[in-house]
From Swiss-Prot:
A lipid is attached at G2 (N-myristoyl glycine). This is cAMP-dependent protein kinase catalytic subunit gamma. It comes from the Eukaryota. The gene is PRKACG. SMART domains: S_TKc. The modification Phosphothreonine is found at T197. Testis specific. Disulfide bonds: none annotated. Pfam families: Pkinase. Phosphorylates a large number of substrates in the cytoplasm and the nucleus. A number of inactive tetrameric holoenzymes are produced by the combination of homo- or heterodimers of the different regulatory subunits associated with two catalytic subunits. cAMP causes the dissociation of the inactive holoenzyme into a dimer of regulatory subunits bound to four cAMP and two free monomeric catalytic subunits. It catalyses: L-seryl-[protein] + ATP = O-phospho-L-seryl-[protein] + ADP + H(+); L-threonyl-[protein] + ATP = O-phospho-L-threonyl-[protein] + ADP + H(+). One of its GO terms (molecular function) is protein kinase A regulatory subunit binding. The lineage of its organism: Eukaryota, Metazoa, Chordata, Craniata, Vertebrata. ATP binds at L49, G50, T51, G52, S53, Y54, G55, R56, V57, K72.
């Protein structure tokens, strides 16, 4: 019993040390956001992966390295017209500052006269939503496997005072090893305390709301 308690305390200390270091790294990047780390002509556009109300996501290839990425292209005029400027700037600033295995990573960002570009790692497995719809339901071990990754990702985010605010199967991507990547930080925000804004996806709201 004593050994088990001591082991648990040691594991918690390791987690706390990791989160403390991660917070320091995040705060540095948060306070020193990267600007224009690439340009459009460095990428070859291959195909459209998805479209949204004010932009689209394309599969691109980096001409120099040959690496594939997902490029989110946001139309500036539509962002302004739909009053999404704050959300867009928040998304970019958060993505360039976070670093965790189960969160999608921003590799490059830049802009031109018409668009904002967020270039993220390409996650080839697609959305969890598609997999879940195909199989009907996950087994209990699968569900626990995925849930553990979501819990760890959100423990990391919440330790940085970040809230995602749009967790759903469509925003969970599955990589080539079968692990999750939380994506779409369009509603994400850094706050201390409560927020009073109703946001997210209506179909996933708690019934009592």
């Amino acid at each position: 019993m004593g050994n088990a308690a001591a082991k648990k305390d040691t594991e918690q200390e390791t987690v706390n040390e990791f989160l403390a270091k991660a917070r320091g790294d995040f705060l540095y990047r948060w306070g020193n956001p990267a600007q224009n780390t690439a340009s459009s002509d460095q990428f070859e556009r291959l195909k459209t992966l998805g479209t949204g109300s004010y932009g689209r996501v394309m599969l691109v290839r980096h001409r120099e390295t040959g690496n594939h990425y997902a490029m989110k292209i946001l139309d500036k005029q539509k962002v302004v017209r739909l009053k999404q400027v704050e959300h867009t700037l928040n998304e970019k600033r958060i993505l360039q500052a976070i670093n965790f295995p189960f969160l999608v990573k921003l590799q490059f960002s830049f802009k031109d006269n018409s668009n904002l570009y967020l270039v993220m790692e390409y996650v080839p497995g697609g959305e969890m939503f598609s997999h879940l719809r195909r199989v009907g339901r996950f087994s209990e071990p699968q569900a626990c496997f995925y849930a553990a990754q979501v819990v760890l990702a959100f423990q990391y985010l919440h330790s940085l005072d970040l809230i995602h605010r749009d967790l759903k199967p469509e925003n969970l991507l599955i990589d080539q090893q079968g692990y999750l990547q939380v994506t779409d930080f369009g509603f994400a925000k850094r706050v201390k305390g409560r927020t009073w804004t109703l946001c997210g996806t209506p179909e996933y709201l708690a019934p009592e709301i």
